[in-house]
Amino acid sequence: EAARYPFAPYSGTGLEQGRRGSGGQGIAAQVWGMTPVEYLHKADVWPLNPKGEILLGLKIENHRALANVEASVSVSGIGFAEWGPGDMGMSFGLPDNHDEPFPKIMEEARSRILAATKHAGIAFLNTVRVDDVEMRIDEGVKIGAGPEAAAEKGRRYTKRTMPW
């Protein structure tokens, strides 16, 4: 609701009327390279608005967020979720477990978040490297954060091309 304007359709979304206010669209439209009126219609949440260009995501990065992950990723308008291994580890009392290999409790947390995103039909964001991007794609990672070489390898693996 906070990311949507009051005029955005909300019937059937499980959300209330948008609460985003007026006034900031002039400068934002300049940044986006369009008129304020165009901005008002494009600066909406995809997939609720198929023409919207804002993608909302969640970072599930501690045990409290993990306890609610299934409900959180089911909120209308959420497009992806990721886990935060560094903070997740700290919340489990593991101050230096931000990199692989992860202990069992961390692997279980990541698996639960990945499963929740699959069930909700949204993307899972995870770090990818050149040496693991294909495995990450196979396990269900839809948004990979990593170096350009990993992105290129992932595009070749999925036979996807960039539009430019």
Per-region residue spans from a language model:
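Catalytic cores of alpha/beta
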Residues: E1, A65-S76, N126-I143
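C-terminal helical cap(s) of enzyme catalytic domains, especially alpha/beta-barrels
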Residues: E1-A8, H98, A149-W164
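Alpha-helix-loop-beta-strand connector modules within alpha/beta enzyme cores
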Residues: E1-P9, L48-K51, P101-F124
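Conserved anion-binding
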Residues: E1-V75
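Hydrophobic faces of well-ordered beta-strands that scaffold small-molecule active sites
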Residues: L56-I60, A81-W83, A123-T127, K142-P147
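Active-site-proximal loop/turn and secondary-structure-junction residues that shape catalytic pockets
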Residues: I60-R64, D87-G89, V130-D132, A150
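Glycine/Thr-rich beta-alpha phosphate-binding loop at enzyme active sites
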Residues: I78, W83-I105
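Glycine-rich phosphate-binding active-site loops on the catalytic face of alpha/beta enzymes
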Residues: A81-S91, V141-T161
